[in-house]
Structure formats: structure tokens, C-alpha cells
């Protein structure tokens, strides 16, 4: 709407803008003409020109007698006028010639308008007034006397006053005066606001003009003529369109409205009659299938409906889709939404429809008849009209299977009784809503069937009402002849339905009316969607009595009604009542007592028991109610049954007792009650588990405590692994179930017994390992269990079959917390040895458990000094094993680093570390205070030991730490002797370079290190010899040992060719004899090859030997036997042994010189044997 208004205003503004532009153009033209005239005029002052004077004189003659030759009658006055002035303006002043006229009569015109015209004629001045009537009259007067300029000025003045409300009037005026500008302007405004014009706006317009305008403005002139309620215009349209009738009469406009419907909706009976007389279709329908009669009723138009019915409209026409007849629409009216007058008019229409032959049994798209609709709408007026119709079928059902009576029993009337409702504005529901004046009562009086069973479900109206929770309706039907034992397709009676929905009053009434409380359903009822969350007790069950239903759906008030009825039925005078049977079972084999328990109705259950219900009845699966209550975990029901003496000894088909079931279902109160009643607490289940274990295995300590409190044995010997005997404590520890183990300990079970063989000796290792619970807990690392065992007096020093105590087991299993607990125990003995002879400390060291070892040392300070069967303490063993971690640990706990092995060797840890070759351990022992000069039983220091092995680094470490490098052992050997003896080149280098050891010292055998080298030299002897000379260039090579043997002789005797060559190369004497007269020339060897090569390699003359006898023939020198020397080998010879002479070129001896036979051969043959 707002957008349309804006569009119209914009169009109107556009017209005004166009008009303004025209005026601007005209003004510009006028100014142009004025300037042109001024240029052509006399150059004299404009006030002195002839034209100016003439105009001024004419203006002054207005209403003056001067020069007057004419009288004009204006109203009651006579005005002096001048013919020449009038003639100058127009020639149309009178029918006669103006020159012969003495008086002009204008008394028929408005005097004020006339005077305004005369003033303009004389002065050319016109005063506009905001009065459209005045301007219109002035324009008409100007048109009468053909004063064209005045008319144009008035026309423009009127245009500024035109609006929606007066545009029609001005259009008429413009048309009369042929004022085309004004007429076009009004036409534009009419076109812009065509739909906003009212019938009053057209009332003064002539029929011809209005018809002409309507035809020009709309495609549907007839509809517009009816809307403005102009019958004369309709008549003109009918005359003009006579050839196209009646087709034109049945056309719908853009809004889908028919001409006849427009006339009827405005109550234009004459026009409507005219249209009908010209064959307008009274049954014409719109695109929705609604006829004129439907529309008339829809808008509550009694006039239209009556007119159409009288003119033969089809009274059974149905709309498209909804299929509603006029009777349906009439019935839809409700007194809650419409006034009593409207309702009365609808009743008149209904009466007229029925009199005209309307069918009261027609059904709409939902299958509802007008009677259905009137009941649903509460339309008592139409309802009463329909009941009077003899053709009315009361048993027709809608698509939901509902008869009119079903709808009526759901309709509660509002009482108008002042005693019930003293305040008219606040309606209240009357308690007796189904009185004789109610729809339902009137339908039954008219003959409606009270049962009307549904074809799909077989439910009668009574069952439907009860199922919908409408107890008042159900009571009404029950007391008005409904069949109380009617059964639907599932075998359910109204009493079942009432019990299922908790309708206590209806249940009582049905029982009074003779309903059978022992009828059982034949099939399970379908589960409604909204009941999906309800208890499953009522799902898929049949063979239910009404009492089953009431209990299953948890309606205790209904149950009470039936129980009271049983008590009353025995004394009732009414033979209709039947006594309920409480022993009947449903398809799940449940009695009403069981259902009462499951729904928590224990008061009802007690009453049922009081009425003779059996408490120990078994179901088909062998379960009693007590078993079922426990399995449902319904403690309240189970306790209820126990209080009422239910049998606790009955077993299920699986052999389970009530006690086992109660434990399995975690019901502590029920367990307590069963134990209180003397149940056997030792009965095992099918797996051999006693009740106490069942409780503990499921973490039910409260139940276990209850069992123990009632005297249950916490030890409980039973079968174990491999058929041995074990307690529950053994089993709990084996399964790592600490809470259970601790509970059993606190409950006083046997904490010290190991497992036992079975009665016939059954059992494998477990039966004979002798491990107590404390051993087992320590092995599995069960800290809480160990602590609990210690608190409750377990033997901390008990030994198993291997002699191990619990702390042995804990250490071997590396459980630190448990070790700490055991070490902290006041009664523990830390010196107990197992069969391997290991104490706890030894065990800790074996498993490198330093933390445990330290804890033991804190408790037992001498533990670290204990020795094994080889006399070794832990430090000795750790050093021998090169276990630096253990060594460091023992050092950290201040173990004695100088303790000796308690055997024949008496070695210290430092000796052992050197033997093991561990530099890091040697260093740490020295740092820890080990004595570096401690001697072995052979009086050897650690340096002696290191020198014998290839341990140069350790030798350096010992030297750095101040070892006595000059110390000699029992054979007088210092470290260098031993290093040379074992050929340790690197050790020798360290000794020769890093200390001042005496390299020429003789041992007890009179041998220096080089003698040792000659005697014991190995492959690297030559390298060692070179090292000696490198470190000691002036070493005495020819110094003999105690036997008089030099290094060369010793090496030659050992066949050490490399060493011999090195010694000869160093300039040693070749022919020195030992004490036995042996030298390298006469020593018996297999071949002289080595000797010849040694002689051949001589590069300079060797030193001469000295002595008292010949080195070759041993002849003593005297006066007759002179001394000679071999110039090649330097030996001392007699004359006979040195007869050969030969130049020795390599010695730069060019003259022949004396040589021995061997050297002669070497020099002549080249060293070849």
C-alpha cells in the first residue's frame, strides 16, 4: 500500500513539474514580446505614450459615471459601464447589438463573481482566491461571454486546486466548458488515482460521461460501474454489450471477482436482479472451485446466500480440494468467534439450503459431513437444523473413522447456568457437561449407535474415549448403553483400556456395569510412538487381565479400585459383578504380584499377598520372584519378599543361590538380609568361587564386609594352579588384585602359609616353592599388599624352598618401594643367606641395585665386607668383573679399598684392578685412597703387575700416583725386568721415559734388564734393545751377568738373530767367554750361518778382547806363547790360531793383517757357510 501511495504522489509531482515548465516557457515568450514592443515604441517616456494613457483612462472609468453609456445589473445594483470597453473585450455580451442596448442584465450570476469579471475587463487585474467554487463560476461566466483570456487564467488557477477528491467535479466542469487543458490535467489525476476513487466521487457525474470515463480507464467497465453502485451506467453497458451477453456478465476481473458477486456483496439487489435477468450464471465458480454461494456464506452474507438460493443456485456444489458444500461452510461458523446474530443468520441459510434440497450427508475431503463440522465448531444453530432433517445419516464416519457421536462426546459444552457460572465473562466447564441438551445426548436420542466399532482396530467408542483419556465421555457412554465387554482386534475390553490409561472412575463404573475383570488380551498391543520410553513391562505382552494392565502401566489408584471391588463383590447384591482372579498369568508367565513388585507398588503387593497370592511360585524358567527381583537389581522388592518370608534356599536352573545372585547384582542390603536369615556363605558357584571371592572380584567391598561380619571365612582354602591348595589371599596376589588382597588381610586371613599340595599330592612347582603371601607380593611388586601384610604381622624373615626371604625376592624383582618397606621393618635379618649363599646385600649387588644396597648398608653397616666362598668381598668381585658402576657405588659407601682377598694371593682391589686391566677403576681406587705400594705375597707392587701386561696407561697412572718404581720382588726384579721379560715394549717405553728406574740393576740372578732381554727376548726384542740404546746410548753392552754371559752370548744361545744383529751393530764385543768358556764362536749350534752373517755385517774394527788364554784353542799365554788379536772379530788368539793374513778393505786395512780361520773364511767366501 505504501509503495502505491508513493508511486501516485510521484506521478502527481511530475504533472506539476510539467505545468511549471510550460509556465516558464510562456513567461519567457511574454518577456521577449514585451522587450520587442518597448524597442518599437516612441522614445518618449512610457507614461506619456498614447497606449499607456488610454489604458490608464480605461482603468479609471471602472464603476464611474463619466462617459458611461450602459448600465449592468449585478444582483440588486446597477453598475455604470462603457460599451467601447466591453466591446474591446468581447462581441458576445447579448443577443442584440451592444450599441443599441441600454442595460445589460447579469443578475442571474453570482454578484461577487460578476464584479470580479468587470474589474478584470477594466483593469486587467484578477485576484485569485483559494475557492474552487468561485473559480469555477468565474470560468463559466468567462466562457459565457467568450472572455478567452479570463477563462484561461481561471483554468490555470483551478488546476492548482485539483486533488483526488474534486478531480471528478472539475473534469465535468472542464468537459462542459470544453476546457481541454483542465480536462486533460484532471484526466491524468483520475488515471493515477483510479482505484482510490469512491462511489461518492462519481455520484454527481452523468451516466454517459461516467460510462465514457470508465470505458477509457478500465478493461472491466461493468465491474467498476457496480463498484460505484451506478445502475444507470450498468444499464448503458448492457445496452452496448447486448450482442455479447451473457458471456460478458460472467467475466472475472483482475481480482477474480464476478460482476454478480460484486453486486451481491454490496447488497445491490436491483443490479443483481438485472444481471440475473440478463442470464448471469448464479453457479459460476472461480479458479479455486468456489461458487458465488460458497463466497457469500464464507463472508457471512445472508442477503447474497438467500438471493442465490432463490435464484436457483446449485446447493450441493463442492469446492475443489477441500470438497466443502455450502452446508459445510455454514456449519463451520462457531459461536466462540461470531455473534449470535451471525449464528442466527447461518441457521437461516442452513434452513434455506435444506429446503432447497441440500444433501446433509455429503462428505468433504476429510470424510466429514456438515454434522461432523457443526459439532467440531460447536455450532448449535446448524446442528439443530441438521438433526431435524430426516435424510441425515448419523453413522457416517470421516476418514479417521469417527462418527458424529464420537466427535460429540469429545465436545464439552460450556454451562450458562448462573449458579454454575455467576460471571458471564468467565465461562466454566459444567461438571454435567453431557446433560440431555448436549450434542452427544441429543445424538443418542436421535438414534446414534453408542458402540460404533472402528473397522481397523475394532475399538468401540467407549474404548476410544478411554484411550484418549476422556473419562467423562467414557462414563457418559458407559451409562448410556455401551457394551462393556466389547473386545477389539487384540482382545482388549473397555476395562483393559480404562486400566491401561489410569481411569479409576471409569474402571469402577465398568465393574459396576458387569465388566469381566478376568478377560485376557489375545495379542500384544502395538506400542504407540509416544510410549517408546515407557517401561518394557507392557511391551509385546498378551494374556493380560485388566489388573495386569493397571499394574504394568503404573496406575495404583486403578489397582486399588479392583482390589476393593474384589472385597465388595463378595457382599454385593448386584449379580453382575465378577470376582477378579489374582492367579492368572500373562504371556511372560507373570502374575499380578510379580508385576506389582516390578512397578514398585509394594503396598498393592502386600494387599495381593494378603489376598492369597503365592510368594514362592516359580516361573517357567524356574525362577522365583526373589530371584527375579535380585536379577532386576530391585533391592526394595527383594527386601519386601524377604520380609514376607520368601524361601532363600531355592536355586535357579543354573544352580545359583539367592546369595550368589545378590552378590552378582551388587545388592548389599539384600546380601545382608539373606545372611541375617542364615544363608550358607560357603557354597561355591559353578566355577568354584565362594561368595566372598565373588564380591571381591567385582570390587564390592561393602558386600564382602557384610559377609565377613556374618562370619564368612576370609582364608578359605581352595583349588589353585595345577591342583594345589591355596587361600583366597594367594589367588588375589597372583591376580594382582591389591584391593582384594588388602581386604582379606584386614579381615584376618592366614598371612604366612604358603600354598600346599593337594590331598593326593597334586600341584606342580607352586605347591612346593614354599613362598608365603609376602614372597608372592614382593615378587609381583604389590606395594599396598606388602605394606598391609607387614602391618598385620606377616613373617618378614620367612624363607622359601630356595632359602630366599621376601627381601631377596624383592631385590631380584627390582621393586624399590617394597625393598624399602622390608628394610625398614624392625624384625628383618639382613644376614640371612639363600642356597646360593647370597645375603640381601649380595643379591642387591648381583642385580646392580645400588639403591637397595645403600639402604641395606644404612641398616647393616658391615654388609659390604662380607666375603664369598672364595674369600672375595663385593669390591673384589666388582673390580674383577670390571663393574665400574658397582665399584663407584662401593667407593661411595666407603667400602675398604685396601682390603685383601681372603685367599692365598692376598691381593688388594688395586692389584685386582691392574690384573683386570681397567684404567678407570685403577684411577677411582687411587682417588678413593688405595695404597699404591701395597705388595703381593711375591712382594710385587701394582707396577710389577701392570708391567707384566700390556698396560702402559695404567703404568703411567701408577707412576703419576707415586708408585715405588725401584721396588723389587722376591727375585730382585724391578718393574723393568718384568716388562722386558714379557716383551711389553710400550710399558718399557713408559718406564724408561716417565721415571728414573735403574735400567742396569741386577736381580738376584745377577741379570740386568738387558740380560733378561737376551734370555727371554721375543719377536720385538730388537725393538726393545733399540729403545734401551735410544734412552741410554752409553748402556754397557758387554757387562756380563753372574754366569759371565753377555747379552750377545745369551741372545745367540737363544737363537735370537734380530737381537744379535742389533747388538753387533751397536759395537758389542763378539768373542767374550762366559764362566764356562763358552762364546758365540764355540757354542754348539746346528749351523754356523748366524755367526757368519754376524761377522759379515761388521762394518768397523770391533774392540779387542783381553784374557790369559787363546779364545780358540784355550792355550795359556806365556813366554813362549804370545797374544795376538784377530783384526776382524777382535778375539784374543795364539800364534797358531791366527796364522792367516788378509787385507780388510771394509776396515780400510789395505795391507794384509792377522785374522782367525773363521774370519778368513768369512772374508774370502762372503759369509757363506
Swiss-Prot record:
Keywords: Acetylation, ANK repeat, Cytoplasm, Endocytosis, Endosome, Membrane, Metal-binding, Phosphoprotein, Repeat, Zinc, Zinc-finger. Zn(2+) 2 binds at residues 1126, 1129, 1156, 1159. GO terms for cellular component: cytosol; early endosome; endosome; endosome membrane; extracellular exosome; intracellular membrane-bounded organelle; lysosomal membrane; macropinosome. ANK repeats lie at residues 217-247, 255-284, 288-317, 322-362, 366-396, 490-519, 542-572, 588-617, 621-650, 654-683, 687-716, 724-753, 769-798, 802-832, 836-865, 870-899, 905-934, 938-967, 971-1001, 1005-1037, 1043-1072. A motif (NPF) lies at residues 421-423. PROSITE patterns: ANK_REP_REGION, ANK_REPEAT, BTB, ZF_FYVE. It comes from the Eukaryota. SMART domains: ANK (SM00248), BTB (SM00225), FYVE (SM00064). Disulfide bonds: none annotated. It is a peripheral membrane protein. It is found in: Cytoplasm; Endosome membrane; Early endosome. The modification Phosphoserine is found at residue 270. InterPro entries: ANFY1_BTB_POZ, ANFY1_FYVE, ANKFY1_BACK, Ankyrin_rpt, Ankyrin_rpt-contain_sf, BTB/POZ_dom, Multifunctional_ANK_Repeat, SKP1/BTB/POZ_sf. The keyword Zinc-finger applies. Proposed effector of Rab5. Binds to phosphatidylinositol 3-phosphate (PI(3)P). Involved in homotypic early endosome fusion and to a lesser extent in heterotypic fusion of chlathrin-coated vesicles with early endosomes. Involved in macropinocytosis; the function is dependent on Rab5-GTP. Required for correct endosomal localization. Involved in the internalization and trafficking of activated tyrosine kinase receptors such as PDGFRB. Regulates the subcellular localization of the retromer complex in a EHD1-dependent manner. PANTHER family: ANKYRIN 2, ISOFORM U, ANKYRIN REPEAT-CONTAINING. This is Rabankyrin-5.
